């Protein structure tokens, strides 16, 4: 029963992505070269987090689940940076409002997918410890004093750096 809401949200995100792709194809809409490259970077990060979360769930692997939150934070950072960059392109007239809306839909969907993966990872970790204190766990893992989190976060920042 607990999995149904997450699955439904994930299905809604997938449907949103499919609708966006269909709209772009039907209306012959294309992103700028820069926007396409940025989406490729974020897409790669999202593909990695999906793979990590799926494997952690299937194997009930707490250690693997612990690698997910730093990547989720990098994806959050990517969303903010991509939003800012695309807004500048819109203001400069390099992109249309229509492509801007589609771009924002895609990065929002990517970020929500990463959030679902993070939620799954936290569940795996917390249930392995016999508790379910997600907010406390996330606060402690993201603290500056958590060297493992910070190292992973910095590694992912380098891996998914925008140029």
What are these model-predicted stretches?
Residues 1-163:
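Cytosolic, long alpha-helical scaffolding segments
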